UniProtKB/Swiss-Prot annotation:
The record marks 123 as: Increases basicity of active site His. It comes from Rhodococcus erythropolis (Arthrobacter picolinophilus). Pfam families: Abhydrolase_1 (PF00561). It is an enzyme of class 1 (oxidoreductase). This is 2-heptyl-3-hydroxy-4-quinolone dioxygenase AqdC2. The lineage of its organism: Bacteria, Bacillati, Actinomycetota, Actinomycetes, Mycobacteriales. The gene is aqdC2.
Length: 270
């Protein structure tokens, strides 16, 4: 059941389900932009028997799509910490989809390895920002281009792997986000790549190394796998898994497989 809490002056919707087995951390599920916590509705049932699972919707991403002031990774991080403190979550592993990964890494940096011992990210572009994606996130910030940019991104994210549950999520559960949210997403994403170079560059700047895993289906190129192998060669705390999915939405498309990856990764330390 979805609950609501006002934190830092904004509405935050969340679900808090299950109880972690002895010695296991909670799992905190973070979405990308333009999704609310229902993105994880197919994954949570596979995790809740073993873990306490907290899923939240970012500010401005509640069911009413409440308009709020400007915000970015800093505010998303602060809201997440405030929620976890309020509901008594101490040690946890962030599980982040796409550009929610920037928040997961910021949480790790701010809270330290004792509270955030591991991070799992799904389907985030690990290279420097590709030119076509850079053009798309710039177009998201233009009133006359944002809808076409969003449509183009959605087409690439689906890659022909349309299913009824995924269509329901994209067309019904994810509707209602207007130019305000999509333009902000473009700016925040662009700013993150400009600041850090890439998510891997951000990982290298963490104050304390800890195990980080990236699981992904896109893009389907050998050079992308080689990038991950090379990064692990420099940083043994990093690992990756390529998934057999077709879309950019693994928690929706492959919930059982993602749950297996999460359990294996978290249980390495327990």
């Amino acid at each position: 059941m979805t609950a609501l809490m006002t934190l830092n002056g904004v509405r935050i919707e969340y679900q808090d389900i299950g109880t972690s087995s002895a010695g296991k951390p909670a799992l905190v599920l973070l979405t990308g932009w333009g999704h609310d916590l229902r993105y994880y509705r197919r994954l949570i049932p596979h995790l809740a028997p073993e873990f306490r699972v907290v899923a939240l919707s970012w500010r401005g991403h509640d069911a009413d799509r409440t308009l709020v002031g400007d915000y970015g990774v800093h505010e998303q991080t602060a809201d997440t910490i405030a929620l976890l403190d309020a509901i008594g979550v101490d040690v946890f592993v962030p599980v982040a989809h796409a550009h929610g990964g920037w928040v997961a890494l910021q949480l790790a940096d701010e809270l330290g390895v004792q509270r955030v011992p591991r991070v799992l990210i799904a389907d985030l572009i690990m290279t420097t920002i590709p030119s076509d994606f850079a053009a798309a996130v710039r177009d998201l910030q233009k009133p006359d281009r944002w809808k076409s940019a969003r449509a183009g991104l959605a087409k690439s994210w689906l890659s022909g792997g349309v299913t009824l549950p995924l269509l329901k999520h994209l067309l019904i559960e994810s509707r209602g986000f207007g130019f305000d949210t999509w333009a902000r997403s473009g700016r925040v994403i662009e700013d993150a790549y400009n600041r850090w170079g890439s998510p891997m560059g951000r990982m290298e700047q963490l104050n304390e190394p800890r195990p980080i895993r990236h699981v992904f289906s896109h893009p389907k190129t050998s050079s992308y796998d080689e990038l991950h192998v090379a990064f692990r060669g420099r940083h043994p705390w990093f690992s990756h898994r390529r998934l057999a999915g077709r879309t950019h939405f693994p928690a929706h498309e492959l919930p059982r497989e993602i749950a297996t990856e999460i359990r294996a990764f978290v249980n390495e330390s327990t």
